[in-house]
């Protein structure tokens, strides 16, 4: 299985920041950099940020005592029409940076192969057992208007 660290911080070579989810698959020596975005803003900045973190991942892995034989990169985007439109508007940029899509990414995560990959997939909000959205997410509440007589 995978061992994960959420918000893995780094300060290397004058660069500071954090990786949303840094993971390792001990059996294969793979390290995965997972950038999680609720939505996509600047496509170029997003890709450059993931590239920078992937470049620093072997150093971070070494400091954690992890063996690193390869780094895979994933961009995980919140499901939604706006996110899909923004990815589609910059399809060539995202396809070049993240060659694989959702099903292929999930398959690799379940059973990593010998080669590192890069992929983009959309993730829907968590659902509870009754099928509703996760209640831990803050709900929008509208104040009631005063009634007039």
Q: Each predicted region: which residue ranges?
A:
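Conserved catalytic cores of phosphodiester-cleaving nucleases, focusing on short active-site segments
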Residues: 19-42, 48-57
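Histidine- and/or cysteine-centered catalytic micro-motif in compact active-site loops
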Residues: 9, 36-39, 78
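Short, flexible loop/turn motifs enriched in small residues
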Residues: 14-18
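Short, structured loop/turn "capping" segments at alpha-beta junctions
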Residues: 3-4, 29-32, 61-68
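Domain-level recognition of nuclease-like catalytic cores that cleave nucleotide substrates
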Residues: 69-147
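Short, conserved, surface-exposed binding loops centered on an aromatic residue
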Residues: 13, 23-26, 65-66
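Short, charged, amphipathic alpha-helix that recurs within catalytic cores of restriction-modification
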Residues: 46-64, 73, 89-90
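A short acidic/basic microdomain associated with nuclease active sites
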Residues: 1-13
